[in-house]
Amino acid sequence: MEQLTLNPIGKINGEIFLPGSKSLSNRALLIAALANGVTKITNLLVSDDINHMLNALKSLGIEYTLSDCGTECTVIGNGGFFNAKKPLELYLGNAGTAMRPLCAALAASEGEFILTGEPRMKERPIGHLVDALAQLDADIEYLENKDYPPVKIKGKALTGNTVTIDGSISSQFLTAILMIAPLLETNTTIEIDGELVSKPYIDITLDIMRRFNVSVQNNDYKSFIVNGKQSYQALDKYMVEGDASSASYFLAAGAIKGGEVTVHGIGKLSVQGDKHFADVLEKMGAEIHWKDESITVIGKPLTAVDMDMNHIPDAAMTIATTALFATGTTTIRNIYNWRVKETDRLNAMATELRKVGAEVVEGKDYISITPPKSLKHAEIDTYNDHRVAMCFSLVALSDTPVTINDPKCTAKTFPDYFDKLAQVSC
């Protein structure tokens, strides 16, 4: 097993230009593929999850050209749903941002499809999405375990209807239905059962749909009305914002050991909810300065917070390791959906935080972290989860080194993360 030991970092200072957002990159690729016309996507994220989407689109007959560096992609739209001449099996790794939207899009396409992935993907629920698609008369069969991939889809023309969808596990299920609904023949009303998690990710979906000329009526996130017979219209250029979740590690590092750190690619104008990670740092004591497309943090002594972080579920993981440098006990609440991500992140974070000496309480949907007087050197297991690896790199901001097992798992969203961290480390 490969390991990376990070020696103690004395100070953090500098500027970071963020890679493109994973959430926006895969949404943009799929919508551009369904659109009328040719779209040029810039600042596309170069990562495993994006490669899985690109490979799937190629198998589905979508033509695109990718720049040598991988950050620009020109997509020739299909002008609607896909049409596969022969049965296809699409391997999507552990990319939820590919699995869920493609499941919906292929249910409304012509052809037979199997969607599968790596072992962890087969543990990530998809049942609520399949149940919702069944209300549109989709034909989807579980091939191994009920409610989980792999699935077999017999695609056909779907008609709009009133759909009830459980919003309590993942916002990606709603995103998937929203993205296909405008292309159906009749109108669709989507009603949310329970509390909708991760609302900012729905805002991302609605924003990109609007950019591609499709409208949705949002009734306070309790229901959505989508007119049928709409079509996505290609954009000459769509620039993917920097990844706000990836920004969190550098912002936290600046808050802990700054110096001054500026991240470019997100700011006041960003559509991503994870930009509000900076607000949490400010509540903990950091000094934050906002511009339209950048955020600057200046390090100050940090104190613990007790907050509902359902609105920033990915970035909230970074607060769990930032808590190691704050005075008092930090509690992160309403984060049950950590359990259905790339790994059971609540359990993983609790386990690894204890290794470095923290006192941790792991609840069903919350975690409390009390830092030790001094951190212990530990080998951090990363569970093939990019965010666990990046979160625990912050331990090196102490007087203690940290060893990251399987550091290349960051390739899912940020292949050169450790190089970027070194650039701002003094």
Swiss-Prot record:
Pfam families, A to Z: EPSP_synthase
Transmembrane regions listed in the UniProt entry: none
Gene3D superfamilies noted in UniProt: Enolpyruvate transferase domain
One biological process term in Gene Ontology: amino acid biosynthetic process
Active-site residues (renumbered): 314
Summary of the function given for this chain in its UniProt record: Catalyzes the transfer of the enolpyruvyl moiety of phosphoenolpyruvate (PEP) to the 5-hydroxyl of shikimate-3-phosphate (S3P) to produce enolpyruvyl shikimate-3-phosphate and inorganic phosphate.
Protein name per its UniProtKB record: 3-phosphoshikimate 1-carboxyvinyltransferase
Organism: Colwellia psychrerythraea (strain 34H / ATCC BAA-681) (Vibrio psychroerythus)
